[in-house]
Amino acid sequence: MATTASLHLHLHLLLSSSRRRCRLLVPRAHTDSISTGRRRFIADTATASAAAAVGPLVLPRTPLARADQPPSLSEWERVLLPIDPGVVLLDIAFVPDDPSHGFLLGTRQTILETKNGGNTWFPRSIPSAEDEDFNYRFNSVSFMGKEGWIIGKPAILLHTSDAGDSWERIPLSAQLPGNMVYIKATGEQSAEMVTDEGAIYVTSNRGYNWKAAVQETVSATLNRTVSSGISGASYYTGTFNTVNRSPDGRYVAVSSRGNFYLTWEPGQPFWQPHNRAVARRIQNMGWRADGGLWLLVRGGGLFLSKGSGFQFFYRGLNDAHAISYLHPPNQITEDFEEASVQSRGFGILDVGYRSKDEAWAAGGSGVLLKTTNGGKTWVRDKAADNIAANLYSVKFLGDNKGYVLGNDGVLLRYVG
């Protein structure tokens, strides 16, 4: 097939280097003045009402913010950013060797940098990303040690080996199938890159050469196996709507129309398609802290896979410590159960786990939900209801370092 041949043709992509506070005062009665007259009571009440009219009543945990100060939330605070209101924030990462140093990406050629743990951010100019008349959408950033990677659309790949002090641009082949949507630093001079057509590439020499980890794009796989039994998969020509990677290198992706999903794990030659377990179309999917899957549907529903989501098949070997997999390597359970959520009818767009039990979900019109039982039940953080933005992404980079990314330049930081 032409698509397969094209992917093999680029198995190795040869790349060259480059407040005022006011309390409601109610007079306290003295023991010797219990017989205070009706006239005195009316006067005291009027005084209290006038005092209340002078300034607003301040509620605990939600102080009124000045015009130049962002509002406080129960467990999150908003961080003001020096960017245009229309920017959508897309990814964030910190340098492992310097946790106070991080980068924030977005649309409209947005790259922001912090050197104080995310308290303040400033624009970062990268000359090699400004040579052309493109308005880049920077999709993904990842660090390991001092080595980092940034990818964007139109196709652009940036690499640093000094914790982001300097960046070099690495040219890419014009024949790369699809748009780059995700990159993960995996080791010294090594990274893994994914496109929205399902191509996965790995490099071990700073991006100068890339090797295909799958034999063909998703559309080629699905159109070759038209009898797969996956609803909406036959004659598939779309791309991924979302793709998420587990800590151990497994991927789950949602088709562009949300009518099915796909999984892949290291060693598989192809992506594996799966029927969606619910009637409504899928919005997003990702990995729980226990290894299972969470699934969001359009309209605000949230589902959790039963068990860990994976059922492994082992082949008996002479060496009892060796494990291999039958084909297909894994069977993903398609058995999901719905969780109890209060999203006010707004769609939930992403979920991020802080621990095995605690997670946060975010969505349209400032919806922010919390679970403390692994996702079975969720409670809305009402303090976030006044945020006039869609919250697209929840990212926990450690137990106490978490961020919510939204449109209109909205960034929330976890303060616990």
From Swiss-Prot:
Coiled coil (UniProt feature): none
Principal localization reads: plastid
Tell me which InterPro entries the record gives.
PSII_CF48-like_dom (IPR028203), TAT_signal (IPR006311), WD40/YVTN_repeat-like_dom_sf (IPR015943)
Q: Where in or outside the cell is it found?
A: Plastid, Chloroplast thylakoid lumen
Q: Which Pfam families match?
A: PSII_BNR
Q: Which GO terms describe its cellular component?
A: chloroplast thylakoid lumen; photosystem II
GO terms (BP aspect): photosynthesis
Chloroplast as a keyword of this entry, yes or no, is yes
Transit peptide per record: 1-36, 37-67
Keywords, ordered alphabetically = Chloroplast, Photosynthesis, Photosystem II, Plastid, Thylakoid, Transit peptide
Provide the family line: Belongs to the Ycf48 family.
What's the record's remark on domains?
A 7-bladed beta-propeller torus, about 54 by 55 Angstroms, with a depth of about 25 Angstroms and a central pore.
> What does this gene product do?
Essential for photosystem II (PSII) biogenesis; required for assembly of an early intermediate in PSII assembly that includes D2 (psbD) and cytochrome b559.
Q: What protein name does the entry list?
A: Photosystem II stability/assembly factor HCF136, chloroplastic
Q: Whose protein is this, by species?
A: Oryza sativa subsp. japonica
Q: Lineage from the top down?
A: Eukaryota, Viridiplantae, Streptophyta, Embryophyta, Tracheophyta
